[in-house]
Amino acid sequence: YFMKKIAVIGTGGTGYTVAAELSLRGFEVWLCDATPVEAEAAYIEQNVEVKLTGAMEGTATVRAVTNDPKAALADTQLVICCTISNLDEQTARFIAPHLYPGSAVLISAGNLGALIYHRVFQELGVKDPIVGDTCGNLFSCRRLGDRVAFAGNGYSPKKVAAFPVRDTGKLVKAFEGIYELIPASSLLETTFNAPNLLSHISLTIVNAGAIENAKEPYYIFKQGICRSTLNLADGMWAEKKKVMDALGLPCAPSPSGNHRKYADPTVHQFDHFKNLIGPDSMSSRYITEDIPILGCFFLSMAKALGVETPLYAA
């Protein structure tokens, strides 16, 4: 039976995976394409079957797939935004006119998106919104086709922070029974401890030649890990640790520990994760999203703190 209506914004891999997984658990999910269109181009497709594969399996019936934000956001105060961080302002403006007072907006994978959403919501007069970021994406996933999503992992509890941070408890409570969320101290903690700041950047740049010359689909977590990437990850992590220490924030462990497990043929815990396809070029979001939005902000913060980060700067 349907328990609560949840609006999921964004129809990429994360949007489809989140919508399918929630639907399998009995929630009424409206999945909304975040590309603005003219009113006459709006559509609503009801009871859409979405196949979920990989670490989570099942065929879900998503209540509706649409590009009409008014319909998607009707009669709900629970919103999960799953668009690329480069589109945060566009997405915030897309949903703002249709939000109910007191709506809770969870941004996956965060990346300081709550700052932008908060500013837009203030500008457009949204009443009492609760908006916050997850620390890393809700799922590592891909959209494989029109109605097929691949999950590299199941759900594990996520740290979250709202902006302003005094709303973090309200955000956790709003999604109680939907996701287990753990309060973080600030958006800086969730942003800098997200794995993409380090893993995507280090793995992709070192493997640029292999990615661009690949004749077959490339799997970076299966093919891209070697001694050099492990050393680079540890070096970048040491720089990150200095910045986190200067901020007085906890620092997540170096990803090299998990990367070593990915490279170990006797370890099968991460087999689905290693089957996440891509990237296929140097214009993938691993570069175009994670470097300008995460990497550059991290460098600015390090500079403001007087912490040297030569590897990140390079």
Which residues does each PLM region occupy?
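NAD(P)+-binding Rossmann beta1-loop-alpha1 motif at the extreme N-terminus of oxidoreductases
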Residues: 3-52
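Active-site-lining helix/loop region of Rossmann-like oxidoreductase modules
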Residues: 158-254
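NAD(P)-dependent Rossmann-like dehydrogenase/reductase catalytic/cofactor-binding core
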Residues: 212, 230-314
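Rossmann-like NAD(P)-binding element
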Residues: 56-99
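Rossmann-like NAD(P)(H) cofactor-binding subdomain of soluble oxidoreductases
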Residues: 85-147
